């Protein structure tokens, strides 16, 4: 413990103990106290001579909310994170999986409601990435679907911070699994559209005439408050009033 105190608190010290317990330690412990002390001393010198690890951002898809639907890679990223910057829709059960010492930052957004500005989120990513932290940017569903991912990647790229993407199960896939349906069906539809119910200007506009055609299938995200608007636009463009619609929440 006294040797590890020579290293700065946080990732450097955690890396030291990981290397000891999973490599140097097991090899030395069978030979007694002196080999263990020597192994600790040698490992400490090695870690003190290392350059500080660069910060890194993992853009992680948190899935639809059930922690059992997280990927193993997402679970590992949470376990190794120094900082977790998470969205409003991330469930408490998933947040519980983050490393206990991690700094947790809520950057929740809500359509037509209080939200953290995107510029603030970008600044947080850059700030913690430049500090050398391993950052998890935790987004609900899949990070690449309606998550403003490109803007955040551009922000960290502009400052030379490394990043990678961990995909997650998108809400549309989880929703149809819950109700025992599929997004595509032979003889019914050869394509499916992912749409958003609202954008930065308000209710989102789409190619309503195309969507109103028979056999079209769409998964509409963030569509609860815009449901009447969407219904009206589809009917205006000739949609059959008997077209089936399924609403899935939580």
Each PLM stretch: what is its role?
Residues 1, 92-93, 111-113, 170-174, ...:
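Short gly/pro/ser/thr-enriched loop/turn and capping motifs at secondary-structure boundaries
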Residues 72-80, 98-103, 151-155, 180-182, ...:
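Short, solvent-exposed amphipathic alpha-helical segments in soluble enzyme
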Residues 62, 89, 140, 197, ...:
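Cofactor-binding loop segments of dinucleotide-utilizing enzymes, especially the Rossmann-like FAD-
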Residues 2-57, 119-120, 130-135, 191, ...:
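A contiguous loop/helix-start segment that scaffolds small-molecule binding in enzyme catalytic cores
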Residues 42-59, 77, 81-169, 174:
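Class I S-adenosyl-L-methionine
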Residues 65-67:
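Flexible loop/N-cap segments at domain edges
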Residues 142-214:
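Class I SAM-dependent methyltransferase SAM-binding "motif I" and its flanking Rossmann-like core
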Residues 102-109, 160-164, 183-193, 238-247:
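Short hydrophobic/aromatic-enriched beta-strand-loop microsegments
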């Amino acid at each position: 413990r006294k040797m590890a105190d020579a290293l700065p608190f946080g990732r450097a010290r955690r890396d030291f103990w990981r290397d000891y317990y999973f490599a140097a330690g097991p090899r030395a412990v069978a030979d007694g106290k002196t080999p263990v002390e020597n192994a600790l001393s040698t490992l400490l010198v090695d870690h003190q001579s290392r350059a500080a690890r660069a910060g890194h951002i993992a853009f992680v898809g948190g899935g639809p909310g059930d922690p059992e639907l997280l990927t193993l890679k997402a679970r590992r990223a949470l376990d190794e994170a120094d900082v977790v910057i998470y969205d409003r829709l991330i469930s408490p059960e998933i947040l519980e999986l983050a490393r206990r010492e991690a700094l947790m930052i809520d950057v929740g957004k809500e359509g037509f409601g209080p939200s953290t500005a995107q510029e603030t989120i970008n600044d947080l990513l850059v700030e913690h990435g430049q500090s050398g932290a391993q950052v998890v940017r935790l987004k609900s569903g899949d990070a690449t679907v309606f998550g403003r991912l490109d803007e955040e990647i551009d922000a960290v790229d502009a400052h030379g911070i490394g990043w990678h993407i961990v995909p997650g199960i998108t809400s549309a896939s989880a929703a149809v699994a819950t109700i025992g349906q599929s997004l595509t069906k032979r003889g019914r539809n050869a394509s499916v559209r992912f749409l958003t119910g609202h954008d930065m200007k308000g209710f989102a506009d789409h190619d309503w005439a195309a969507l109103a055609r028979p056999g079209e299938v769409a998964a509409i995200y963030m569509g609860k408050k815009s449901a009447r608007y969407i219904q009206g636009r589809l009917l205006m463009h000739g949609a059959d009033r008997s077209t089936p619609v399924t609403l899935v929440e939580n």
